[in-house]
Structure formats: C-alpha cells, structure tokens
C-alpha cells in the first residue's frame, strides 16, 4: 500500500505494518483501545508487557509521559542523536491507559527519523505503537513481502524499505541507563 492508504487505515484505527530502522513494525493509534486490542491479538502479545511508542519528535509523547519527573539532563538524553536506535523507558502519566503500559508505571518511547515514521506521525497527528512485525517464534520481517507472507496478502503494509540498522532498537531505562534489551 502507499503512504496515503496506510494513513487512512491508521485514522480508521486499523493495525498496519511499516518500516522502522531495522525491521518492519506493527503499529496503530495509541489513543484507540480497540486498535491496540487488535494489535495485541494479532501479535499474540500479553497486555501486561506494554508497548513501545515511536515518533519523529518528543512532542508526540507528551500525552503519555510524566514530564515533571524528567530533569534537563534526561531531556538532553532523549533528544540526543545516537548511532543506533535506542528506546527509552520513561515515567508514564498516572492516568495512562493500561493497554499501553501494561503492568508498569512507565512507557517505552523512541524518537525515530525513519522517513516512514516521520510522515505517518505528521499526517495522523499521533505517535505509533511499535512492535516487531512477526508471529511468535518467527524472525521479524525485513521486507513488505515477508510481512505479507506472515500476515496475509491483504494485510496493510507500507511499501517502503527499512533503515540501515542491523538489529532492532536497544531498550534502556532513562534514569539508570540500565540495558533492558540488547540492540
């Protein structure tokens, strides 16, 4: 599908596949519980685990993160450009939907300059959920054709290329810098 068709699907609270820095991601509107529920069912992902949000700028995350707990040093860390994609675990707002953060009082966010993510967020006005596009036990998809093989020929997938990162993002705690997932 082209970018316009994918944007329409996202606005209709559908789940789509889109390229990220290393692999294809499954994403939807994080403000829509029905969209997130569809994503969790499709991915067979336990709700307790929470989800990653991805966007081209920090502003897209302000509805989800507790900004008061983040000091200027941590803001700099979030805004910095890194040689590889990094997802940061940050404090979530107290009223954040549990379907996004699972059993945690935090949420994982990643600022991405991938052109697909930039266009999708700018055109929809929201960050995207981001979980790797693959069924349980199968490697994440690196091409739109692989997505169609796993999820069906009619699955809405954006026909663009993934970035040059060799592996999906590493995940780190913003405050402790502890590595949660190796990238």
From Swiss-Prot:
Top EC class of this enzyme: transferase
Biological process, per Gene Ontology: regulation of translational fidelity; tRNA threonylcarbamoyladenosine modification
A GO molecular-function annotation: L-threonylcarbamoyladenylate synthase
Name assigned to this protein: Threonylcarbamoyl-AMP synthase
Keywords, in A-Z order: ATP-binding, Cytoplasm, Nucleotide-binding, Nucleotidyltransferase, Transferase, tRNA processing
InterPro entries xref list: DHBP_synth_RibB-like_a/b_dom, Sua5-like_dom, TC-AMP_synthase, TC-AMP_synthase_SUA5
Primary residence: cytoplasm
A Pfam family hit: Sua5_yciO_yrdC
Lineage top rank: taxon: Bacteria
Residue ranges of domain YrdC-like in the record: 1-183
Source species taxonomy: Bacteria, Pseudomonadati, Pseudomonadota, Gammaproteobacteria, Pasteurellales
Name of the gene this protein is made from: tsaC
EC number: 2.7.7.87
Cleaved signal peptide residues: none
Reaction(s) the record says it catalyses: L-threonine + hydrogencarbonate + ATP = L-threonylcarbamoyladenylate + diphosphate + H2O
One Gene Ontology cellular component annotation held by this UniProt entry: cytoplasm
Family according to the record: Belongs to the SUA5 family. TsaC subfamily.
Subcellular location(s) of the protein: Cytoplasm
Job description of the protein: Required for the formation of a threonylcarbamoyl group on adenosine at position 37 (t(6)A37) in tRNAs that read codons beginning with adenine. Catalyzes the conversion of L-threonine, HCO(3)(-)/CO(2) and ATP to give threonylcarbamoyl-AMP (TC-AMP) as the acyladenylate intermediate, with the release of diphosphate.
């Amino acid at each position: 599908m082209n970018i316009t068709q994918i944007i329409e699907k996202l606005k209709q609270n559908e789940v789509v596949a889109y390229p990220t820095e290393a692999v294809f991601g499954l994403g939807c509107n994080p403000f829509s519980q029905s969209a997130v529920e569809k994503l969790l069912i499709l991915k067979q992902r336990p709700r307790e685990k929470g989800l990653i949000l991805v966007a081209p700028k920090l502003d897209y995350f302000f509805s989800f993160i507790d900004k008061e707990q983040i000091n200027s040093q941590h803001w700099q860390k979030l805004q910095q450009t890194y040689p590889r994609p990094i997802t940061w675990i940050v404090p979530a707002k107290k009223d954040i939907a549990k379907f996004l953060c699972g059993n945690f009082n935090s949420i994982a966010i990643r600022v991405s300059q991938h052109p697909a993510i930039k266009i999708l967020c700018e055109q929809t006005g929201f960050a995207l959920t981001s979980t790797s596009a693959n069924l349980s036990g199968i490697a994440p998809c690196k091409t739109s054709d692989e997505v169609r093989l796993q999820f069906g020929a009619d699955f809405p997938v954006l026909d663009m290329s993934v970035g040059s990162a060799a592996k999906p993002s590493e995940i780190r705690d913003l405050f402790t810098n502890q590595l949660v997932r190796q990238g």
